[in-house]
Design a protein with these regions (language model features):
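Multi-pass alpha-helical membrane architecture of UbiA-family
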Residues: 1-212
Length: 212
């Protein structure tokens, strides 16, 4: 859709302008910020040109790049609390599962483009097994964040995630068409979007004090 609406030249121009602006504004923060965003931009380029078509590694790098900006600020301020890494693990596993669902969803197009994705090389059944393992692993940090860490009212979100992920696993077993994979993809996207808004629940009193 985007390829039909926007020319390649426009996309490249926008890409370079936005990257330049991100590095420019980062220079006002610190030299470390410039290094981080420069490395991040290079990582995106390297992934899109060299790693995107590599099964397993491409999915892993894509998920890593997706979570990197969210946790860079904690690294910058040297905040290495365990709860942050558990949150990062939860998000990483969720995004990695989403990347693999996208491969199932786009099998026909990837075959036409001669992409060697996991479901094309090893079959949809193998991909489902891998996704099931990832979702099972995602349940672990969800449980840890509920039982062992103070996440305020965000525990409600993680309880909801457990039920959604269990439902996801049931639907995954029964899925056998692109329509089913789109639904599964949307479930994971919903969990991620709700997670962003649920950050406000970590400390409701603090948020209310800032607003009022």
């Amino acid at each position: 859709m985007l390829d039909r609406l926007v020319s390649q030249r426009t996309k490249l121009t926008t890409y370079f302008v936005l990257n330049f602006l991100s590095v420019f504004f980062a220079s006002y923060v610190s030299f470390k910020a410039v290094v981080f965003f420069s490395a991040y931009i290079f990582g995106i380029w390297f992934y899109s040109h060299k790693l995107k078509r590599v099964p397993f590694l491409g999915n892993f790098v894509s998920a890593t790049l997706a979570i990197a900006p969210f946790f860079a600020v904690f690294v910058y301020y040297k905040n290495f609390d365990t709860v942050i890494f558990v949150h990062a693990l939860f998000l990483f596993l969720l995004i990695l599962a989403r990347e693999m669902i996208k491969d199932l969803e786009n099998m026909a197009g990837d075959m036409a483009q001669n992409y060697k994705t996991i479901p094309i090389l090893y079959g949809a059944k193998f991909s489902k097994i891998c996704i099931s393992i990832l979702i099972g692993l995602t349940l672990v940090p969800s449980f840890l964040l509920i039982e062992y860490f103070d996440v305020g009212y965000m525990y409600i979100y993680f309880i909801g995630c457990i039920f959604l992920l269990l439902g996801f696993l049931v639907l995954l077993v029964k899925s056998n068409s692109k329509k089913h994979y789109v639904w599964l993809h949307n479930i994971l996207k919903l969990i991620i979007i709700l997670g962003v808004f649920s950050i406000l629940l970590i400390n409701v009193d603090l948020v209310l004090n800032r607003i009022l």
